[in-house]
């Protein structure tokens, strides 16, 4: 009988320790999930994409004169897969989030080249959509506001196409980009989609875009 009691006590202790460990793991996962919010490179719930989230992403870059936080909400009914980012100037230490399901939003950032260099942050990012087409987003934060302004653009290209210099030139010069003027703008993207976006006019800028079904 005493042996059975001892075995019972040992088993109870093991179960309690396992439950405690599982609870700790769950709590840590929850903390990781909370930390992932407002971190460049993360994928968050689309409904939680706000200016405040992007300002947090922007602030994390530190004291940099030219920088941008980008948030793109996927309400397209499709899954997006990252292709690449092309930087005309500037850089990012963050890798594009690989997979962005419907109902989620990606967070990304960019900054001017390091050091005392007179550059802004200008680039294009591309995502392959599950319908076989490509979502492309342009962002342009110049160094010299005496000559240039903030600009952004969004377009769906037929087929899969990586971001490059040619895509940048098309989106910046030829395809009616929007000025970063602290206002919302809308565009029919074709292929049953539409886009709505906002960019401010600051050298420390945010770009928020929502891609939805038309």
Curated annotation (Swiss-Prot):
The segments labelled Plays an important role in the hemolytic activity in the record are 38-47
Q: Which GO terms describe its biological process?
A: cytolysis in another organism; monoatomic cation transport; pore complex assembly
- Using the UniProt annotation, give all residue ranges assigned to the region (Trp-rich region, which is important for the binding to lipid membrane): 140-155
Q: Show where the record puts the motif Cell attachment site, crucial for protein stability.
A: 179-181
List the propeptide region positions. 20-35
Entry keywords, A to Z: Cleavage on pair of basic residues, Cytolysis, Ion transport, Membrane, Nematocyst, Secreted, Signal, Target cell membrane, Target membrane, Toxin, Transmembrane, Transport
Q: Which InterPro entries match?
A: Actinoporin_PFT (IPR050677), Anemon_actinoporin-like (IPR009104), Cytolysin/lectin (IPR015926)
Annotated GO MF terms? channel activity; toxin activity
List the GO terms this entry assigns under cellular component, sorted alphabetically. Answer: extracellular region; nematocyst; other organism cell membrane; pore complex
Q: What is known of its domains?
A: Composed of a long N-terminal alpha-helix and a core region rich in beta-sheet structures. Before the pore formation, the alpha-helix binds the lipid membrane, partitions into the lipid-water interface and stabilizes the monomeric molecule on the membrane. Finally, it traverses the bilayer, thus forming the transmembrane pore.
Q: Which family does it belong to?
A: Belongs to the actinoporin family. Sea anemone subfamily.
**Name the record gives this protein:** DELTA-actitoxin-Aeq1b
- Organism of origin: Actinia equina
């Amino acid at each position: 009988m005493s042996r059975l009691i001892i075995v019972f006590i040992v088993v109870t202790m093991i179960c309690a320790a396992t439950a405690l460990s599982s609870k700790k793991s769950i709590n840590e996962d929850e903390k990781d999930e909370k930390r992932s919010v407002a971190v460049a490179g993360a994928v968050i719930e689309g409904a939680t994409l706000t200016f405040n989230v992007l300002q947090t992403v922007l602030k994390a870059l530190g004291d940099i004169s030219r920088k941008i936080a980008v948030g793109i909400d996927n309400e397209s009914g499709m899954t997006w897969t990252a292709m690449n980012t092309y930087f005309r100037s500037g850089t990012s230490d963050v890798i594009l989030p690989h997979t962005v399901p419907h109902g989620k939003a990606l967070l990304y950032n960019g900054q001017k080249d390091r050091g005392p260099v007179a550059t802004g942050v200008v680039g294009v990012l591309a995502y392959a959509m599950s319908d076989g087409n490509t979502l492309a987003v342009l962002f342009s934060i110049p160094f010299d506001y005496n000559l240039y302004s903030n600009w952004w653009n969004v377009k769906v290209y037929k087929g899969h196409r990586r971001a490059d210099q040619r895509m940048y030139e098309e989106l910046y010069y030829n395809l009616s980009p929007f000025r970063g003027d602290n206002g919302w703008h809308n565009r029919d993207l074709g292929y049953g989609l539409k886009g709505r976006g906002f960019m401010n006019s600051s050298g420390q800028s945010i770009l928020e875009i929502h891609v939805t079904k038309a």
